[in-house]
Amino acid sequence: MLRRAARVPILTWHASDVAGPDHGSNDHVAFREDLEHLTRLGLRVVPLAAIARSLARGELSSLEGCIGLSFDDGTDFDFHDMPHPQWGPQRSMSNILADFRARHGKDTQPSLHATAFAVVSPEARRKLDEACLIGCRWWHDDWYAAAERRGTIAIECHSWDHNHASLSDSVSRAPRGGFMIDNDADAEAEISEATRVLRTLRKRDGDVLFGYPYGDVSDFLARDWFPRRAESLGIAAAFSADDEEPVHASSSLWAIPRFTARHQWKTPGELERLLREAGALPRPLGRITSLFARRAAIATTVPAAEALPDWRDYFQTWEVNDAKALAGELFRKSFGHDIPDMAHHYVLVYSPPAGSDDVQPRIVAYVHQLPKEGFHLCGGMCVDERAYRTFPKWLFGQVRDAGGLATLVTSDSMQMLGDSPAAFGYVGDSKARAADLRTGFVDTGIDLLMVKWLKPLPEEEKRRLVERAAALMPF
């Protein structure tokens, strides 16, 4: 079995953000242009519910090359075409989706869908309409059921009243203008009641998704309240905002990351760069249906330095079952014995560019991970140093600048660890130590033992985990 370290981006827009006629000032223009550009990039739109489901089941790799779309606040602009007194008629987000389908047909983006996270309280919406919009009554709930029936927008929960700074009162006692809830009473008031009422308004039972107001994720909600209460309330997942990464295998189900329009990109080109830097774009040159099946060469021209292909297009990290058959020889050359039995084995696959003497994909690095109670052990990292000599000069330079093959396979495998607070490495040579340092590992104070902290922990808990990992050396 091969499984790639999938990275699935989720984007969000605010339909009420209408401050001009162009992409950087109007989220309707931005959404229309972004949707076209995402399609040209080869990304496949899937519902947020599908992303949450795949993450919960440990099947995110099935969504490689996919993307999720969402809108925040749930104003009427999401569903109705609205006249803006300064900037004229605004095509609704729902109708922008319909226009896309009419232009391209059902075969392009067959799963076209978006999620609207709505503020549920009618009174809060009325007050926020006056305070935050321009008092034109643009914030109703009478369209929720119609949107659900249309089938391209799901209405989900953005809390009872957003705990908004513009409100004179809120059901939450948390500081206004944020959502850092830290107790059961406030969580029940903002989320439980909103979830119940939302099901009635949208006329659809079943699971609810939650979008954190302001993207504020408190430790109490993500690590305590949602894990305790979500199942009984029928809440399937919770989504943050303004994040710096796409969804990956170790993302928390209660803090699924999203990127936000205008905050993080203002043109389709900026969006493409954001996704490329996050490793979230499809990698057509690295797609292989059978690891050792030859593939047709893909023409690549390199006319100038600024036009160089991205080195990541030629490398993929996979989790494999039969590591001894795939990477056993490489491991034996490095360590003098067979690959040990471990829970998780990862290989880095290199697919040479067109024009190379051999376009056969091959394994150039290996690492394994062993889960323990409360942490992971990372070891066995080895690299086929001969591979560097076969890289084109431009590719060699990019890989070197990125930290090398060891850094890549270690970093990718860390993305696939799952919900773990720490990863420990047993580091026996200077090259492995350098790669671990580039990946975020630090010294523990114990010879040869390094650690990467994946979650904030009290110092006492860190010391306890270090002692437990040290007792397992070597690994």
Where in the sequence are the language-model features?
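Short, solvent-exposed beta-strand-terminating loops
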Residues: M1-R3, V8, I155-L167, H368-Y388
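Hydrophobic faces of well-ordered beta-strands that scaffold small-molecule active sites
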Residues: P9-L11, L69-F71, A114-A116, I155-H158, ...
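Active-site beta->alpha N-cap acidic-glycine motif
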Residues: A15-T152, N163, T200, G206, ...
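His/Asp/Glu-enriched short active-site or ligand-binding loop at hydrolase and phosphoryl-transfer sites
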Residues: A52, L201, G206-L209, Y214-T267
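Alpha-helical scaffold elements lining the catalytic groove of polysaccharide deacetylases
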Residues: W139, A145-R150, D161-R202
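Terminal substrate-recognition subdomain of acyl/acetyltransferases
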Residues: A299-A307, D419-F475
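A conserved beta-strand-loop-helix scaffold within acyl/acetyltransferase catalytic domains
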Residues: P309-D313, W318-R386
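Acyl-donor binding region in acyl/amide transferases
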Residues: H376-G440, T444-I446
